[in-house]
């Protein structure tokens, strides 16, 4: 992971050098990362497209067992659906690999953003430890969670830290001030202006809006009757944005800002992918044809069983 941290840190530092405004640099950084990960989005969309093509046949199977909620019947329906997937060379887990690949990348991204001294400026080891000790001495803090929380103190008292900054001058230290806002400030910190509460509130709004919009451009697989999937999805629609807001409330404001940018870019990406790889639409006749094919297949199987 350390190589990934260094690579992302180099990209973020390059963005800041190109545009010496941290808000714009974060947006540029988020855009670059989204472009790099775009092929994973393509793979997911293609997998959804393939699943959507099987929708009439899958719904025909579910309709065949509709109204019978006993365990044996539900297992039989699920078995037939899995056999359909196997026959059509569709894997339910085909869309999981991109998500699994993205997970460590997301962790690396947030670590890089939270620790600019280490990953943007390359300060580590004894020098970083000494900087942390000076920070705690000046502020009375008992510990240091991230580099971001030290940045305002370092800029305000740069002479105290200069000897341990690897020759980096004050003008090279990233400024997190955007107008009256300091993006290195944590919204739940004591003595912080209530205006910083806008960050977690907006993070929730962006996350919730992005989730709703993305769903409109994403294939939604049919659910079996009598399951709790619909309720679970509704709960997720609220809990995930709330989780985003909590993270934005308890971590430096720049994390919330980055999360907002990512939500916007993810929504735009899904809209683009939905146009590149369109989900097929079916008529009522298509669904009836699938039911007739299923009925015909069932009759053939029964005849074959009797013959044996």
Per-region residue spans from a language model:
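Helix-loop-helix
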Residues: 1-308
């Amino acid at each position: 992971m350390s190589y990934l941290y260094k690579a992302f840190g180099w990209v973020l530092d390059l963005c800041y050098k190109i545009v010496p405004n941290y808000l714009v640099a974060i947006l540029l950084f988020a855009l670059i990362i989204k472009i790099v990960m775009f092929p994973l989005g393509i793979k997911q969309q293609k997998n959804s497209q393939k699943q959507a093509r099987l929708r009439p046949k899958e719904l025909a199977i579910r309709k065949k067992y509709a109204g019978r909620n006993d365990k044996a019947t539900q297992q039989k329906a699920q078995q037939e659906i899995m056999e359909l997937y196997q026959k059509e060379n569709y894997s339910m887990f085909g869309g999981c690999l991109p998500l699994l690949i993205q997970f460590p990348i997301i962790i690396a991204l947030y670590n890089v953003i939270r620790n600019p001294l280490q990953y943007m400026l390359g300060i580590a080891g004894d020098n970083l430890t000494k900087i942390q000790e000076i920070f705690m001495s000046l502020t009375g803090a008992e510990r240091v969670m991230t580099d971001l929380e030290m940045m305002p103190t370092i800029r305000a008292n740069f002479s105290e830290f200069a000897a341990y900054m690897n020759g980096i001058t004050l003008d090279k230290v990233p400024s997190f001030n955007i107008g009256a806002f300091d993006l290195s400030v944590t919204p739940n910190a004591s003595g912080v202006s209530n205006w910083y509460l806008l960050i977690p509130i907006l993070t929730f709004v962006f996350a919730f809006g992005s989730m709703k919009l993305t769903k409109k451009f994403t294939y939604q697989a049919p659910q079996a009757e009598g399951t709790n999937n619909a309720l679970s999805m509704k709960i997720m629609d609220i809990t995930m944005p709330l989780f985003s807001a909590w993270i934005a409330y308890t971590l430096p404001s720049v994390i919330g800002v980055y999360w907002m940018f990512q939500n916007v870019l993810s929504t735009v990406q899904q809209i683009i992918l939905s146009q590149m790889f369109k989900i097929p639409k079916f008529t009522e006749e298509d669904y009836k044809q699938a039911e007739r094919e299923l009925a015909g297949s069932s009759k053939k199987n029964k005849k074959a069983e009797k013959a044996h």
